[in-house]
Amino acid sequence: MAQNHVIKVSKKTLAEMTTVYQPNRLNKTVPYTVFVAKVGTTTITAYQSGKVMFQGPQAEKEAARWEGTSTTPKKKVSPQTTTLPADFGNWSVIGSDEVGNGSYFGPVTVCAAYVDKSMISKLKSLGVRDSKELTDPQIIQLSHVIKELIPYKLLIVEPKKYNEIQPNYNAVHMKVALHNQAIYLLLQELAPTKPEGILIDQFTPENNYRKYVRNEKNQVTEKLFFVTKGEQYHVAVAAASIISRAAFLEELDKESAELGFSVPSGAGSKSDQVAARILKKGGLDLLANYAKLHFANTQKAQKLL
């Protein structure tokens, strides 16, 4: 029997949900909504007011992913307001960030980077900061410099592999698994050195992250901190973001070179047109090498043929 479950979330959480459900968005317009998406049998309708309605047999389960962000039952501290120690920016820290989750073409890249306190000023002097403030050429150039200076672990999930594992994960679970693995591998490399903290650029409430980590073989659960816009709090996250972004851009360039035409980032109408071109050339088998097939862009591209 279908069920309805309604929660009310903050503007920040609504923005986060918009990103998380981007691959599952439906091509339909409903008045006063931010988006309508479908995950399995559950339809999610997010309204501009901050109300989010989950409909379907698994509605309550899907809504539970956002437990701790809802302001409906009682006032809770937003996970986005996590406070860090006053001098955290001067600690020796592992920072992690990911790129590509909302892009139809290209991989998902996740990087964990370790910045010892002795390297903080050096990286800042080189211009290591929020990657959104940098041009693509600057990001690629800085990435090469950063990788020569600090320990890091970079995971690249290319579209073909992504399409193989995606049915077994939701968007949040996949990101948790990748962040956890990148951090774990970096900790193994650093041993016996231990960071004073591990800062994850927050994409889901902390309790949700820890819930999914329990499914992983190698679980990193100590010294974890979660904040949105983590690059503003420690240069380690900025470094991880730059390395992740550069890897994503380089993989997009490889895809473009292989296909003989430019492959865009994002998930807009241009992606539909390029996908249709690839479908004409080699069908879904070829497209699976370059795009995340569960995005709505695939169906839109098929309609263009």
Swiss-Prot record:
Manganese or magnesium. Binds 1 divalent metal ion per monomer in the absence of substrate. May bind a second metal ion after substrate binding. It is an enzyme of class 3 (hydrolase). CDD domains: RNase_HII_bacteria_HIII_like, RNAse_HIII_N. Its EC number is 3.1.26.4. Its main location: cytoplasm. A divalent metal cation binds at residues 97-98, 201. Signal peptide: none annotated. GO terms for cellular component: cytoplasm; ribonuclease H2 complex. One of its GO terms (biological process) is DNA replication, removal of RNA primer. It catalyses: Endonucleolytic cleavage to 5'-phosphomonoester. Its cofactor is Mn(2+); Mg(2+). Keywords: Cytoplasm, Endonuclease, Hydrolase, Magnesium, Metal-binding, Nuclease. Residues 91-305 form the RNase H type-2 domain. PROSITE patterns: RNASE_H_2. Transmembrane segments: none annotated. It is found in: Cytoplasm. GO terms for molecular function: magnesium ion binding; RNA binding; RNA-DNA hybrid ribonuclease activity. Endonuclease that specifically degrades the RNA of RNA-DNA hybrids. Belongs to the RNase HII family. RnhC subfamily. This is Ribonuclease HIII.
